[in-house]
Design a protein with these regions (language model features):
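Ferredoxin-reductase
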Residues: 1-41
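FNR/FR-type flavoprotein reductase catalytic core
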Residues: 31-178
Length: 178
């Protein structure tokens, strides 16, 4: 790593306690992430701070209560990275959650294989129809609700515009959204 690098936000997507490693997900947008693209397993950062921010509200709830809730995660693009560990944690504790992953096109759909192993049901949407259902994530939410799914809570993580429209729809549908 370089000692003169800039501070950038990174998302911890997974970890291995035994190996002492974390998996991070990032989108190449500048010099620092361009350099990181070439890192190999075992390469190190000069400095890494985190995690920052707040933990998932789900961590504060009783597992037995969560088992009785119908949970929907909606992930957009790199927003899939912070969704994965939450769904994995729920799965490890016997709680099913449905997941919608959306992206502008197939190349922006990430962590599909990993998510498939922990999600109750996984739905993929792409704006251009290059993979999964054609359209935006809100179309998929509406389809699921129209099919009789009654979600108690929705966790949406992704681009601001996606979260705005997810919250608008879930509010109309009476689904508590985080």
């Amino acid at each position: 790593g370089s000692d003169d690098g800039e501070r950038i936000p990174l998302t911890i997507c997974d970890y291995n306690r035994e190996e002492g490693t974390v998996t991070i997900v990032f989108q190449v947008v500048g010099a620092a992430t361009e350099m990181m693209r070439n890192y190999k397993a075992g390469d190190a950062f000069a400095d890494f701070v985190g995690p920052l921010g707040c933990h998932s509200e789900l961590c504060d709830e009783n597992i037995d209560d969560l088992k009785n809730k119908k949970i929907l995660f909606v992930a957009g693009g790199v927003g899939t990275a912070p969704v994965y560990p939450q769904v994995k944690w729920l799965h490890e504790n016997g709680v099913d959650a449905d997941v919608i992953i959306g992206g502008r096109n197939k190349s922006l759909i990430i962590l599909e294989d990993q998510m498939r192993t922990v999600a109750g049901n996984l739905y993929i949407t792409t704006d251009d129809g290059s993979y999964g259902s054609k359209g935006v994530v809100t179309n998929e939410i509406q389809k699921l609700v129209d099919a009789g799914n009654k979600y108690d809570v929705c966790i949406a993580i992704g681009p601001m515009i996606m979260m705005k429209f997810v919250c608008k729809l879930t509010k109309e549908l009476g689904i508590h959204t985080v």
